């Protein structure tokens, strides 16, 4: 049942098993991710469909690394370490690099996407919860 654009359904599950994108994202543009895979999806079927926020649960194996730099995006991103260790590297528009190490349960890094490119590498196997949401013009376009 929906009320306006708000889903009034209650849903519970397991984030690791609810991956809708094949990349760990389980809240966000589920319909868009299904379309990328050629699948059909009814966005009104779950409160996990959202244009306002994306949530990712991902278990990384030891030594897992992002291939290259993720270009700055118009969103704010928050990564929270649940277990293991991860190194995140950030590069500002003027070329300044900032390393961040997440080593203790609950360590986090948050950044405003338009300001920073980023990449990462796991030091050991780790589990990360990532939340991102649009800001500024990106939010106005939704």
Predicted regions and their residues:
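Histidine-centered metal-chelating micro-motifs
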Residues: 65-67, 87, 107-119, 137
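Short hydrophobic/aromatic-rich beta-strand segments that constitute the beta-sheet cores
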Residues: 88-90, 111, 128-130
């Amino acid at each position: 049942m929906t009320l306006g654009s708000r889903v009034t359904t209650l849903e519970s599950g397991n984030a690791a098993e609810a991956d809708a994108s094949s990349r760990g994202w389980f809240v966000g543009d589920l319909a868009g991710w299904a379309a990328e895979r050629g699948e059909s999806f009814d966005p009104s079927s779950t409160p996990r469909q959202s244009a306002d926020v994306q949530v990712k649960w991902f278990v990384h194996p030891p030594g897992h690394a992002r291939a290259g730099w993720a270009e700055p995006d118009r969103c704010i991103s928050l990564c929270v370490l649940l277990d293991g260790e991860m190194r995140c590297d950030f590069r500002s528009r003027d070329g300044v690099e900032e390393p961040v190490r997440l080593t203790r349960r609950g360590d986090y890094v948050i950044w405003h996407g338009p300001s920073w490119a980023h990449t990462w590498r796991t030091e050991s196997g780790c589990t990360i919860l990532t939340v991102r949401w649009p800001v500024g013009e990106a939010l106005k376009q939704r």
